[in-house]
């Protein structure tokens, strides 16, 4: 049985230790996810506190660090606008930071039907009413 592959379009902020490990895991296990689960993860945007980089065709697991060096200055609001303008089905904003400022942007993603995945301790321990 040949099933279509479901693509998840990832927009990742925070590419320090946790973000680097995420890239490593996605790169190492990509073929497994495609073959066994018919899921592909395509990274379309990345950012850290200094730079951000987007590519409509996807960002290579092999040279993302080099691409980041040539990215534009990082800005949370502009990052969100670019993610929104991509207008892709199955878009996922991934927050690997410990930033309240980034966590405060989740509402914009969610209101625009963009999934949010986070390990942000500040966001996960904020006021329950907010969530």
Outline where the language-model segments fall:
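A short, basic/flexible loop-to-alpha-helix module at the beginning of a structural domain
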Residues: 1-8, 30-32, 82-83
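Glycine-rich adenosine-cofactor-binding loop
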Residues: 6-27
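Rossmann-fold NAD(P)-binding glycine/threonine-rich loop
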Residues: 99-112, 121-131
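NAD(P)-binding Rossmann-fold cofactor-contacting core
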Residues: 31-72
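Extended hydrophobic secondary-structure segments that form protein cores and membrane-embedded regions
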Residues: 9-13, 42-49, 93-94
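A structured beta-alpha segment of the ubiquitous adenosine-cofactor-binding alpha/beta core
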Residues: 65-102
């Amino acid at each position: 049985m040949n099933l279509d592959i479901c693509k998840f379009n990832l927009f990742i902020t925070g590419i320090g230790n946790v973000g680097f490990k995420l890239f490593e895991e996605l790169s190492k296990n990509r073929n497994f996810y495609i073959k066994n689960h018919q899921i592909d993860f395509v990274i379309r945007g990345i950012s850290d506190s200094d730079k951000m980089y987007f590519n409509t065709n996807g960002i290579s697991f092999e040279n993302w660090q080099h691409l980041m060096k040539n990215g534009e200055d990082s800005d949370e609001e502009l990052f969100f606008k670019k993610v929104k303008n991509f207008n892709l089905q199955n878009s996922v904003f991934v927050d690997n930071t410990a930033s309240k400022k980034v966590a405060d942007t989740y509402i914009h993603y969610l209101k625009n039907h963009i999934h949010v995945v986070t390990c942000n301790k500040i966001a996960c321990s904020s006021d329950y009413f907010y969530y």
